[in-house]
């Protein structure tokens, strides 16, 4: 499918707006591990995922990563164009978790269209509200939810995303998602293994008892 089939506001644009987007649209194919947007140093533009998977995260003062949210097929990201919205001061990094095909609407192009089009402006505000709701939910998880519950939730989310109970993932990767240390995650996973919830092997975690993980995350 083409860009217009993915962009939810295409039919709300006039002919001139459609042309300026088409003339300036950037298509990128990025490999897993590619940094697409790097904090306030970049004003990349609005991202629209055609296929693949992106991860949006922040860095603590100590250099620890924590995932804010992920982007999948047909998802849009505005934080990569936060320079066009003065009230947003959010230093996020966006990385490809898998090989990804995406489109980029340059920030200034999107800013001009947002000024002209009420539907685009309204949609932008709704999308930003949704993303900040995601971030507030994450803060609540970090503040009030114990690490064992957060690890259980993450493992269950991964099995849903990947469609398998055999996860090819490192302890370091989990630590980066959850804003923790690798050693802490390793101890927690070994505890899970002792309890019969998972089986650990090099670069892989096999989920053995998803029901008990679900019970743990809800407790």
List PLM regions with ranges:
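Short phosphate-coordinating micro-motif centered on Lys-Gly-acidic
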Residues: 36-41
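Short alpha-helix-to-loop micro-motif enriched in aromatics/charged/Gly
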Residues: 61-68
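Glycine- and acidic-residue-biased ligand/ion/polar-headgroup-sensing regions
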Residues: 33, 44-57, 72-74
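Cyclic nucleotide-binding regulatory module and flanking cytosolic helices
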Residues: 1-31, 71, 76, 81-85
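Polybasic "coupling" helices that flank or enter modular domains
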Residues: 97-98, 115-180
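Phosphate-/nucleic-acid-contacting segments
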Residues: 147, 156-219
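Cyclic-nucleotide recognition modules
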Residues: 69-125
């Amino acid at each position: 499918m083409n860009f217009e089939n993915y962009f939810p506001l295409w039919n709300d644009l006039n002919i001139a707006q459609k042309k300026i987007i088409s003339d300036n649209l950037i298509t990128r194919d990025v490999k897993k591990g590619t940094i697409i947007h790097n904090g306030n140093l970049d004003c990349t533009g609005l991202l629209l995922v055609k296929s693949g998977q992106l991860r949006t995260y922040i860095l603590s003062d100590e250099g620890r990563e924590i995932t804010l949210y992920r982007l999948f097929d047909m998802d849009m990201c505005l934080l990569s164009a936060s320079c066009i919205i003065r009230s947003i001061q959010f230093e996020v990094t966006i990385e490809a978790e898998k090989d990804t095909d995406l489109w980029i609407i340059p920030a200034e192009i999107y800013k001009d269209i947002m000024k002209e089009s009420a539907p685009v402006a309204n949609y932008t505000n709704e999308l930003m509200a949704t993303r900040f709701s995601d971030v507030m939910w994450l803060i609540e998880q970090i503040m009030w939810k114990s690490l064992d519950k957060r690890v259980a939730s993450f493992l269950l989310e991964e099995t849903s995303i990947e469609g398998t109970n055999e996860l090819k993932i490192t302890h370091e990767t989990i630590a980066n998602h959850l804003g923790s240390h690798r050693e802490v995650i390793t101890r927690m996973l070994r505890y899970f293994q002792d309890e019969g919830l998972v089986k650990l092997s090099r670069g892989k975690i096999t989920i053995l008892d998803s029901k008990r993980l679900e019970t743990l995350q809800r407790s």
